[in-house]
Amino acid sequence: TTLFRSCTAQAAEASGKTKQEELRRQLIVMTGWQYDDLPRLGEIPIPEEALLEEDPESDRTQALAANFSLAADRRRLENTDSGTAKDVLNQKVEAGQQKIEADIEVKYNSLMQAQTDYGQAKEEYRLAEEKLEADERRYQLGLLSANDRMAAQAELSSKKAAWEISGLSFRQAYEDYQWAVEGLAAYEG
């Protein structure tokens, strides 16, 4: 079973590297490069967990104020004479406000979940590091087989990949939330 776990972990690591390479190529093409170009891709900064000071109430207010489509419809509503057109526009503005508020709430919840997932993955990686250190000592003392040692190394690689992926998801959720607050929350669907 140890050999199986080691092989499984190595396969997971190889699969992760393959997915990473596919994503890198997609990113290169999406940003206007040729698929076989080799631009230098830097690290994506992960938001500092302790520095997140999101306030959904004030952010909701800011998102409503910053949304261009909502502001345009409000101006149209002010300049529309009474009647069916005004009623329809009024309903559109109210529905748009509700949709923006709901979008902010969904993105905030996604951000909080991504932050939790990131923290958990970070802790799992730390524990895998400690386990590998202990396994290295046991291996040096002859108390652990080479296969078990390789399995621990593969598990550490797997946990590191999971931590990095959760960090990227955390960053994406953070950016999505910030852009929604800055006026790009869903208004019409």
Question: Which ranges hold each PLM region?
Answer:
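Extracellular, luminal, or virion-exposed ectodomains of exported proteins
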Residues: 1-12, 26, 81-88, 95-98, ...
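Charged, solvent-exposed structural "stalk/scaffold" segments
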Residues: 1-14, 116-164, 179
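Short, solvent-exposed, mixed-charge loop/turn linkers that connect secondary-structure elements
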Residues: 17-58, 175-189
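A glycine-/polar-enriched beta->alpha junction
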Residues: 61-71, 78-87, 94-98, 116, ...
